[in-house]
Amino acid sequence: DTMTHMLSLLPKSRFEESGVEIPGGLAFLADYRPDAIAEASAGIEGLFMPPSHPRLDADLLARLGSVRIIQTAGAGFDSVDHAAAAKLGLIVCNSPAQNAITVAEHVIGAVICLQRELAYADEAIKSGAYAQARERILGRGACELFGATVGIVGLGGIGRALAPRLAAFGATVVA
């Protein structure tokens, strides 16, 4: 069957770079203008899109015609007007916890940067204020994840990925 059934708003290069075989029946669109999406969706049953853009508002959803399902490529799917989709009988799906490990690792990196004032130190050193930065950071003492108590609000995919990583640093995790 060479008919196109799915339209991907994710670039074809994302599929190619990951080494996955691109199935037949999948077309790609790099133009996120509402008119272009509506036109490319003619005869399409499913729409595959990035989690945060483009915005699928009630007007655009009504113009999607034969589309029955919208799948986002991440946990977030607030770029789709869910009330309008429900009225049109569209199924909207996300990929929960898809990026949970990436986000958990980013959180740990951000916590360490904040604890050690790395952004401040970087800027101070670049502007020639090394002595002041050194005095400020060393003056307040060591700040470590080891022995710290860290609270996690919510144990969804990200929280569940974050907890053992924090524990590996020797932190006590409270959720």
Predicted regions and their residues:
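N-terminal glycine-/charge-rich "phosphate-binding" loop or analogous flexible N-terminal tail
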Residues: 1-51
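Hydrophobic Val/Ile/Leu positions in short beta-strands of Rossmann-like dinucleotide-binding domains
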Residues: 8, 150-152
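Short beta->alpha connector loops at strand-helix junctions that form conserved
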Residues: 50, 73-74, 90-101
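Rossmann-fold NAD(P)-binding glycine/threonine-rich loop
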Residues: 78-90
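Phosphate-binding beta-alpha-beta segment of Rossmann-like dinucleotide-binding domains, i.e.
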Residues: 88, 96-149, 161
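Hydrophobic/small residue at the entry helix of a nucleotide-binding pocket
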Residues: 158
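NAD(P)-binding Rossmann-fold cofactor-contacting core
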Residues: 167-175
